[in-house]
Amino acid sequence: MSQSDLDRQIAQLRNCENITEGEVKALCTKAREILVEESNVQRVDAPVTICGDIHGQFFDLMELFKVGGDCPDTNYLFLGDFVDRGFNSVETFLLLLALKVRYPDRITLIRGNHESRQITQVYGFYDECLRKYGSLNVWRYCTDIFDYLSLAAVIEEKIFCVHGGLSPSIKTMDDIRAIDRKQEVPHDGAMCDLMWSDPDEIEGWNLSPRGAGYLFGGDVVDDFNRKNNIELICRAHQLVMEGYRVMFNEQLVTVWSAPNYCYRCGNVASILELDENLAKSYKIFEAAPQENRGLPAKKPIPDYFL
């Protein structure tokens, strides 16, 4: 795949226009070559801008890039949940993946609980692929790539980034590095917990109402951060009406990047910019105005309805 091909595909995807099934296959093949070399805990250099859940809200991702700057000018770290629930999971994920292939050192993608075959069959991505491409091949190519995404990232050895949270099975970074990540998200265990767990105002661990992962308290965060010489845990996974929420004496932050979530929650979104000294700056943004959203593409009516 030539650089000019890739640039054309990126331009098309930025306009919310789909690329062909063959192009998706080639893009995913190239992406796999890059992602397979990345660690379970990917090292990321500052300055970097951290983004939470996007959930197929393509036009709001365009707002995010307006606020945070375009890739590759800005170094980005996305904390997973690129797909499901929104109307444009296909274009959202493929654009982020194309940027990853084009600028591998300027964008890091880690896996969320929705980067899963099972979950996408329920929450929209599967149906969207079928509707837009008329077959499941694109869904298969993309979900195969999900298995190669990193499970976490560490910025300058000091900031631990993960989609969901901590796990009672994980004491150190080496415990994460020991996971065989190239598989469907399991129903329980360390890999599952990283994508499903949530912080809560409790002590220790509790079962999660989500049915997967755990709730974990400030004492757990304190212990993990001390043991691993970490200053901050940065995670996503939970809607925050104000766009971000700091907890546990500034030892953990939730960043949420899908404004007006599901097109009805009325929340703002945020991204977290870290400068080269890891100084934090939260940027708040709102959903893209209606006129920036374009019209949903009308599918031609199949002959048998005419």
Swiss-Prot record:
GO terms for cellular component: cytoplasm; nucleus. Its EC number is 3.1.3.16. Mn(2+) 1 binds at residues 53, 55, 81. One of its GO terms (biological process) is double-strand break repair via homologous recombination. It is an enzyme of class 3 (hydrolase). The active site is at 114 (proton donor). Transmembrane segments: none annotated. It catalyses: O-phospho-L-seryl-[protein] + H2O = L-seryl-[protein] + phosphate; O-phospho-L-threonyl-[protein] + H2O = L-threonyl-[protein] + phosphate. Mn(2+) 2 binds at residues 81, 113, 163, 237. Keywords: Hydrolase, Manganese, Metal-binding, Protein phosphatase. Disulfide bonds: none annotated. GO terms for molecular function: metal ion binding; protein serine/threonine phosphatase activity. Belongs to the PPP phosphatase family. PP-4 (PP-X) subfamily. This is Serine/threonine-protein phosphatase PP-X homolog 4. It comes from Paramecium tetraurelia.
